[in-house]
Amino acid sequence: MHDAQRIASETVDAFNAHDESRMRELYAEDVVFEAPGDVHLTGRDAAVEYAMSWLRAFPDGGMRVHSEIVAGDWVVHEFTFSGTHDAPLQGPEAEIPATHRRPEGRGVEVLQVRAGKVAADHLYFDQVQVLTQLGLMPEPAAAG
C-alpha cells in the first residue's frame, strides 16, 4: 500500500474509532483544514477539534469509504457519514442543539500526505442535506 494511502486509511480508522490521540498523531502540526461553512483552519489542534466536535455531537457517528483515488501524495475518498445527533454541534454561526435524528449523507475528503502526516484535509459535503435531515431546514420543493 502506498504511504499516502496507508495514512489516509489510518485517518479514517482513527475518526471512526473516535480516537483523538491517534488523529493528533496523523495530522501535521501545520495541517490546513477546510470544510463547508467557510471553515478554514490551520494547525493540528484546530483540525482535530473540528472532527471531535462532530464525533461528540454524533457519538455513534462514522464514515464508510466507497471509493478511493490515490495520486502521488494526494488521496481522495468518497464516503457516507451517518450518526445520531445526540449532543450539541457547534456550527460556524451558532450551536445546534441535539435533534436525536440520524442524518446520512455523502461527501468527499481530499487529503495531502507529506512526510507521513496529513498536511492538508479538504472536506466537502452538502450542508443543506444535513440541515434538512436534522429537521432544521424545510425539505426542498420537488422539481416539476
Regions found by a protein language model. Name each.
Residues 1-144:
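C-terminal and inter-domain tail/linker signature
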